[in-house]
């Protein structure tokens, strides 16, 4: 039988010995841990123990299971640990085991105290006499991972500013101000989409009896004028929509290759009538057309190339992939009016047939 307990009062050693005693056992081994009176020249008054009780009891039970798996002959196992303040020379932990032979009992108690120190979440604080501050004692036998004390010191690493990093290795070339502006624009667009969705969910309902359906109301209240209808096969009253991010880091794998896409768009948008007389003018004119620039063929070609470069840098700093691959949000599309067919009763149909019979003699 396993006897496991965390107690906040003095441990009765005699009672513990009686618990593990059994007529079939010829050996009983017991370990008693007490509070010593000094540590590194300082007078120890008492020890204070704290524990995560639920986890500690589970670990102690696992230790008992490991003991029985290793030494099946064990009859009784006892693990008592005291919490709170433990004065000098009083027992803080008692571990005992009984078995038919002494070898199993002695080895089991040794194994149990080692595992208790390394696995069970119990913390010890030493209280000293005089003006010495109390100290929490680190368990050097614990198998739990410890935080690395040797953190990386960035000040030791010297930055070699003489080396010029190639611009091809830099993915984002915008400065901090431009990055902040992009993030703010992204937040504004998402906020506008959410507001548009809220307007659709909580728009003015024509089902209200006190409001004329022919009158359009710009301002409405969602708490008093919205109509809640439970969706089929759902516990929610509002319609749940699946969010589809048409742009962003999650869609990187679905994005086409920009070089091939740029080539395709360039060739598809350029008309054969706009090709200049020379090959150089025609190719430069195609790039200018795609970039949205207007120039004359007789203009200086150096100035035209410079304008194209400035345009490319501008588009590169404002994320050009959104120009061609961003799909229009469904929120921007006008809402389609739902046409409902009128339902006629049997009486109305008879009246209608009777009137038609009179009109057609």
UniProtKB/Swiss-Prot annotation:
Example GO molecular function: molybdopterin synthase activity
Reaction catalyzed: 2 [molybdopterin-synthase sulfur-carrier protein]-C-terminal-Gly-aminoethanethioate + cyclic pyranopterin phosphate + H2O = molybdopterin + 2 [molybdopterin-synthase sulfur-carrier protein]-C-terminal Gly-Gly + 2 H(+)
Organism domain of life: Eukaryota
Major localisation: cytoplasm
Broad EC category: transferase
SUPFAM superfamilies, per database record: Molybdopterin synthase subunit MoaE
Record InterPro entries: MoaE_sf, MOCS2B_euk, Mopterin_biosynth_MoaE
EC number: 2.8.1.12
Misc remark: This protein is produced by a bicistronic gene which also produces the small subunit (Mocs2A).
Subunit (UniProt): Heterotetramer; composed of 2 small (Mocs2A) and 2 large (Mocs2B) subunits.
Family: Belongs to the MoaE family. MOCS2B subfamily.
Name of the protein described by the UniProt record: Molybdopterin synthase catalytic subunit
Organism: Drosophila persimilis (Fruit fly)
Gene: Mocs2B
């Amino acid at each position: 039988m396993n006897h496991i307990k965390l107690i906040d009062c003095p441990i009765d050693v005699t009672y513990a010995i009686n618990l593990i005693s059994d007529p079939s056992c010829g050996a009983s081994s017991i370990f008693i841990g007490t509070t010593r009176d000094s540590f590194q020249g300082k007078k120890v008054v008492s020890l204070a123990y704290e524990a995560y009780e639920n986890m500690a009891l589970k670990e102690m039970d696992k230790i008992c299971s490991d003991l029985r798996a290793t030494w099946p002959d064990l009859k009784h196992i006892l693990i008592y640990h005291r919490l709170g303040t433990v004065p000098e020379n009083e027992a803080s932990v008692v571990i005992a085991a009984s078995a038919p032979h002494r070898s199993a009992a002695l080895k089991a108690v040794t194994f149990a105290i080692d595992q208790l120190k390394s696995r069970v979440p119990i913390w010890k604080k030493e209280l000293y006499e005089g003006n010495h501050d109390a100290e929490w004692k680190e368990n050097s036998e614990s198998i739990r991972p410890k935080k690395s004390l040797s953190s990386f010191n960035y000040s030791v690493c010297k930055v070699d500013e003489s080396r010029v990093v190639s611009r091809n290795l830099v993915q984002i070339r915008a400065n901090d101000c431009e990055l902040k502006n992009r993030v703010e624009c992204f937040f504004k667009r998402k906020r506008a989409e959410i507001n548009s969705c809220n307007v659709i969910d909580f728009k003015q309902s024509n089902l209200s009896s006190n409001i004329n359906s022919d009158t359009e109301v710009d301002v409405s209240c969602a708490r008093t004028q919205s109509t809640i209808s439970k969706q089929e096969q759902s516990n929610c009253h509002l319609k749940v929509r699946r969010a589809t991010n048409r742009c962003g880091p999650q869609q990187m794998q679905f994005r086409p290759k920009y070089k091939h896409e740029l080539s395709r768009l360039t060739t598809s948008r350029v008309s054969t009538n706009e090709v200049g007389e020379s090959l150089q003018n025609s190719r430069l004119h195609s790039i200018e057309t795609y970039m949205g620039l207007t120039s004359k063929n007789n203009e200086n070609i150096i100035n035209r190339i410079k304008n194209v470069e400035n345009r490319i840098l501008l588009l590169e700093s404002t994320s050009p992939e959104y120009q061609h691959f961003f799909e229009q949000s469904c929120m921007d599309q006008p809402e389609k009016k739902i046409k409902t067919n009128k339902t006629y009763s049997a009486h109305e149909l008879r009246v209608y047939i009777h009137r038609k019979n009179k009109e057609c003699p």
